[in-house]
From Swiss-Prot:
This is Peptidyl-prolyl cis-trans isomerase CYP18-3. One of its GO terms (molecular function) is peptidyl-prolyl cis-trans isomerase activity. It comes from Arabidopsis thaliana. Belongs to the cyclophilin-type PPIase family. Binds cyclosporin A (CsA). CsA mediates some of its effects via an inhibitory action on PPIase. Residues 7-170 form the PPIase cyclophilin-type domain.
Length: 172
């Protein structure tokens, strides 16, 4: 099965930082993968909040070195917002895939069944998140870009420079 591939063209402090290409696990997590794919293309238009259902222009608002890089809050931009293509929140699909190492793509949440649009990319193995966060993809190109983003992180999570998804979409 060929998994769909999506991309983020990233900027750090307004400067191009490169492309992150991710494959989405449509076999085990089809609803979660479809949500992320559609938020990369922007094809669903405007959501219930009145904001476009699109990652383009959104920030990575939380970056913690030796842990993860988190983004996807395109409504508030600070980690309090976001919206799925299914409405505000949707259920945890399953926890079959694990947080095995750098490049794992997983849903950020505020507890069980609170998935929206926020996600994170692991920079290390984060097995304590297994069974709590839905893994739905992985970085297949551009792990160096993820590492560059990680370098502008902080222990509080607030990036020292703005990290923005300048463009995004689907490759295959």
């Amino acid at each position: 099965m060929a998994f769909p591939k999506v991309y983020f063209d990233m900027t750090i402090d307004g400067q191009p930082a490169g492309r992150i290409v991710m494959e989405l696990y449509t076999d085990k997590t089809p609803r979660t993968a479809e949500n992320f794919r559609a938020l990369c293309t922007g094809e669903k238009g405007v959501g219930g909040t009145g904001k476009p259902l699109h990652f383009k222009g959104s920030k990575f608002h939380r970056v913690i070195p030796n842990f993860m890089c988190q983004g996807g809050d395109f409504t508030a931009g600070n980690g309090t917002g976001g919206e799925s293509i299914y409405g505000s929140k949707f259920e945890d699909e399953n926890f079959e895939r694990k947080h095995t190492g750098p490049g794992i793509l997983s849903m950020a949440n505020a507890g069980a069944n609170t998935n929206g649009s926020q996600f994170f990319i692991c920079t290390v193995k984060t097995d304590w998140l297994d069974g709590k966060h839905v893994v739905f993809g992985q970085v297949v190109e551009g792990l160096d870009v993820v590492k560059a983003i990680e370098k502008v992180g902080s222990s509080s999570g607030k990036p020292t420079k703005p990290v923005v998804v300048a463009d995004c979409g689907q490759l295959s």
